[in-house]
Design a protein with these regions (language model features):
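Generic preference for hydrophobic/aromatic residues in regular secondary structure cores
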Residues: 25-26, 35, 66-70, 84, ...
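Feature activates predominantly on carbohydrate-active enzymes
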Residues: 41-246, 253, 316-319, 324, ...
Length: 613
């Protein structure tokens, strides 16, 4: 065991000046881990490398004595989304690995749709920042230093939008983002995926995806073979894919939602027969991964774990650190849902638990905003308690990451506007649509609490400014959040003020708003610059072009808005037709004091226009 390498690498994340000279590190066969500080240094006894790394964190924290029994979860993993535009650099993944090690994780899943190189398939991941074989081997080797197993998390059925951008894959395209099942060409592609993973990773576990394939068999498959029950197609494909996995020594994990959706589409009296079909036809050794990022009632987790146990004896759980609703996370909701989910997992003896960090629609939110939830999962796993005090979370996260827990939690406040107090509406990120909604169209204006929204974002900007000063290791994250809040301070209610001034024929007010467009453009450019710096520090360059296009479009529309207002004021046009349209709520719902509740709207294309884009 090369302790010098382990301690030298971990010191990159630990407080400056930490030294492990005089510490005795001993691997034993007993369950759990133990630390005792002495005058000479101290003693750490551990069974597994992740336990050692966690204890080294306690040593750096200044702990006098720590005793932890065996982790409550056999596999505690973090899933890193490497497929939604932002592909983390090898250096970023290594930093993540060090932080996971100090927390006590023993597995890392890399979510790779098409962002890895497949020999013989040049368009697979083309211009998407795909990893080379050398990069993935380097990540795998580095994680092994700390006893962290890197597990490939690929897609073998749906979520393959990237490859269908290219005509090279037309022949195996069923519909939407779904592969054509029962095709020799599809089987050849999947074999290439699995054999490649076998050559790159030490792990003999592989996650084969297969989630959210609702349109399976409804496109080219139906044209070739006629209509067929979706579950039957899925089970046949699953057996074919897992047979290939076994050839390469892999045991498979898969998302379970397609089976659960099939059951819930039927009357409950028909469930037992379909449960038996699934249990009998899911290949032995295949783990069903029950994912749930939403529920705020423990009973839902209890009920769903029991349902999954009727489908398979091998069930794991995946929760979420919500970073996929825009630039700001939803950490209060994530913490609430995580507490309930993990309590249920502990009660029901779920052995494997995963924390996901998806990056839907552009991967706009910074990876490190997930650190509080990451830390929470680790503390629950290693203590068996779900009530972790803020003092413990603060101390542990400070030593494992160098970042203040309270400051990172505060990044969520950009989504917790006056009509959406924490923990907020599930999955709603108003900061994104307040930023991107068109100033002349006001698609979301009825959902803005104009009385307090601007002041809220000014307070957020001040808070993020202080956080940037207090967190030297991740200043850029807080600077970016500050600059976003400064844009939103002016823009969140801009469309409301513009419509009011136009309806009132308030010419001085309209002129002032035309001038304000320039200020919003300047603030947006500062936000864009800090976001780019944040991106360049962590991700490959591929995918940044999307942010340039979106933010550039926003600034262009602000210039157009100023021009349109002035054209109206100087008499070039008699009306501004966009402002004469009645503002409707984005969704039909009940208003309170004239303000409609916020809505879930995460897709940029739906936010910026009512047109096709």
């Amino acid at each position: 065991m090369d302790y010098l390498i382990i301690t030298a690498e971990l010191r990159k994340e630990l407080p400056e000046g930490v030294d492990f000279a005089g510490w005795q590190l001993t691997q034993w066969e007993k369950p759990g881990a133990f630390l005792r500080r002495t005058q000479e240094g101290g003693t750490i006894c551990y069974r597994t490398l992740p336990q050692l790394c966690r204890m080294l964190g306690f040593a750096a924290q200044g702990a006098e004595q720590v005793t932890e029994v065996e982790p409550r979860f056999r596999e505690l993993s973090f899933m890193l989304d490497c497929s939604r535009n932002a592909v983390p650099t090898v250096a970023t993944v290594k930093k993540l690995i060090r932080r996971l090690a100090l927390m006590g994780y023993n597995a890392l899943l890399l979510y790779l749709e098409d962002t890895y190189t497949l020999e013989g398939y040049p368009y697979f991941g083309y211009m998407r920042g795909r990893y080379t074989h050398g990069e993935l081997r380097e990540i795998d080797a580095y994680a092994s230093i700390f006893g962290i197993e890197v597990i490939p998390c690929i897609q073998t059925l749906a979520h393959l939008n990237g490859i269908f951008h290219w005509k090279a894959f037309d022949s195996i395209h069923d519909t939407k983002d779904i592969l054509l099942v029962d095709s020799q060409e599809t089987d050849a592609l999947i074999r290439a995926m699995i054999s490649t993973c076998a050559s790159l990773f030490r792990s003999r576990k592989i996650h084969i995806g297969m989630d959210e394939a609702e349109m399976l068999g409804k496109g080219k498959y139906e044209a070739l073979h006629g209509p067929e029950n979706r579950t039957s197609i899925l089970l046949r494909h699953l057996n074919r894919v897992t047979a290939i996995c076994r050839e390469y020594g892999f045991t498979a994990k898969m998302w379970s939602d397609m089976f659960v959706k099939a059951l819930r589409s039927l009357p409950e009296e028909e469930w037992p027969a379909h449960e038996r079909q699934i249990r009998e036809q899911v290949p032995e050794g295949t783990q069903l991964v029950y994912w749930d990022y939403y529920a705020r009632q423990k009973e839902k987790y209890d009920r769903n774990i029991k349902l999954h146990r009727r489908l398979s004896d091998d069930v794991s759980f995946a929760g979420g650190a919500w970073k996929w609703s825009g630039f700001a996370p939803l950490l209060d909701h994530s913490m609430l849902a995580s507490r309930l989910a993990l309590e249920s997992c502990l009660e029901h003896g779920v052995s494997d638990v995963m924390l996901t960090a998806w990056g839907d629609n552009g991967n706009e939110c910074d990876l490190w905003t997930t650190l509080p939830i990451m830390q929470y999962y680790a503390e629950v796993c290693h203590t068996g308690a779900v009530d972790i005090s803020q003092d413990v979370m603060t101390a542990r996260m400070q030593v494992c990451t160098g970042i203040r827990y309270e400051d990172m939690m505060a990044t969520s406040r950009l989504n917790y506007v006056p009509n959406n107090p924490a923990p907020g509406m599930i999955s709603a990120g108003p900061a994104k649509y307040f930023l991107y909604q068109d100033p002349m169209l006001g698609l979301y204006d009825r959902h803005v609490d104009a009385a307090g929204c601007g002041a809220h974002y000014r307070a957020c900007a001040d808070e993020m400014n202080l956080a940037a000063q207090r967190n030297e290791r991740e200043t850029v994250v807080f600077e970016t959040m500050k600059n976003l809040a400064l844009v939103l301070e002016r823009k969140c209610d801009f469309g409301i003020r513009l419509k009011q001034a136009y309806d009132a024929s308030d010419r001085p007010g309209l002129e002032a708003l035309a001038e304000e467009c320039g200020e919003i453009i300047q603030r947006t450019e500062r936000f864009r610059a800090s976001l780019e710096k944040q991106w360049r520090e962590k991700y490959k360059p591929f995918g940044w072009e999307v942010q340039d296009i979106r933010l550039g479009g926003l600034m262009c529309r602000m210039r157009t808005t100023a021009s349109r207002i002035r054209s109206y004021l100087n008499g070039e046009v008699q009306h501004l037709e966009e402002l004469e349209e009645e503002r409707l709520p984005y969704e039909v719902c009940n208003a309170e004091n004239g303000v409609y509740p916020i809505v879930e709207s995460r897709e940029w294309a739906h936010t910026v226009t009512a047109m096709d884009i």
